[in-house]
Amino acid sequence: MTNIRKSHPLFKIINDSFVDLPAPSSISSWWNFGSLLGICLAIQILTGLFLAMHYTSDTATAFHSVTHICRDVNYGWVLRYLHANGASMFFICLFLHVGRGIYYGSYTFSETWNIGIILLFAVMATAFMGYVLPWGQMSFWGATVITNLLSAIPYVGTTLVEWVWGGFSVDKATLTRFFALHFLLPFIIAAMVMVHLLFLHETGSNNPTGIPSDADMIPFHPYYTIKDILGLVLMLMALLSLVLFAPDLLGDPDNYTPANPLNTPPHIKPEWYFLFAYAILRSIPNKLGGVVALVLSILILAAIPLLHTSKQRSMAFRPLSQCLFWLLVADLLTLTWIGGQPVEHPFIIIGQLASILYFLIILVLMPLASIAENHLLKW
């Protein structure tokens, strides 16, 4: 008699995805982040669901409902800070996951990669709308500044902004629709994750060497289940340390002041995980140009498979490309720092140079380095 996990229509899908899945024997801890992202999504949906039970999406009561959650709801403060810092962990895992994909050439699985880019946009949109919900000063002004960018679109811009706002400014209608969309999007993301995995399992995983590993596969369970559990324990330790010891470390103090349309905060800035894109946006003096650069800063990921000029898939054996990759990482850290600084000398010029370097590395230097490496290896 066949084992039920191999014969039952539903269990069979789970078995083929998490138990008997053939996986390369050489994949390192950089391959842990996919499962960690799945767990982050589950944590966000669960904590978000319980927070939504106590939250009210009305401009008059939103701020106080969050205060009520923290003060009066049983373990409400844990839920709130798990959700807020869970978003930070989500983005840390996302950036590492994408970085791994670039370093080891996983982007050559074009369907998986493109769905991943759409997922990244969806998660960023969800996080942005979530930041608006507590209705603090930074929530309100962040929403005003970022939604206002749509007005840079020629001809339809102003109409589009007022349509998004549901009025002539960020107000009650905006908050209500942002709450509705913030609740809905994670479930759409979960469905897209299924598609992401579906495409991945069509090809199988890549590995650090970038060489096909069909001849050397091992079952996912128990080898990678136990490896993923180790990654999970380490991530949860980091998340819980953040939640229990420094819950406001990554937040903005301005968000503890209720939203006031008559008082603009001195420095409007988004959460830390958007600062690199915000720095690129601010580094261009023209409004439309800034918006285009902002979108391209993420959309450029779609160009990476098209610009792959190397005869090798992975960067594991390509020192020139490795140097450029780590230069790109340093550049992104610089942009993140600049995004949190005021618009004054010397931050303006540093931001502009870092923005130019970002696009230059991806569009020009990396493809050229790959061609040079091909010649050095006489390929």
Swiss-Prot record:
Its cofactor is heme b. It is a multi-pass membrane protein. Binds 2 heme b groups non-covalently. GO terms for cellular component: mitochondrial inner membrane; respiratory chain complex III. GO terms for molecular function: metal ion binding; ubiquinol-cytochrome-c reductase activity. The keyword Transmembrane applies. A ubiquinone binds at H201. The chain crosses the membrane at residues 33-53, 77-98, 113-133, 178-198, 226-246, 288-308, 320-340, 347-367. GO terms for biological process: mitochondrial electron transport, ubiquinol to cytochrome c. Heme b b566 binds at H97, H196. Heme 1 (or BL or b562) is low-potential and absorbs at about 562 nm, and heme 2 (or BH or b566) is high-potential and absorbs at about 566 nm. Belongs to the cytochrome b family. Component of the ubiquinol-cytochrome c reductase complex (complex III or cytochrome b-c1 complex) that is part of the mitochondrial respiratory chain. The b-c1 complex mediates electron transfer from ubiquinol to cytochrome c. Contributes to the generation of a proton gradient across the mitochondrial membrane that is then used for ATP synthesis. This is Cytochrome b. It comes from Rhinolophus ferrumequinum (Greater horseshoe bat). The gene is MT-CYB.
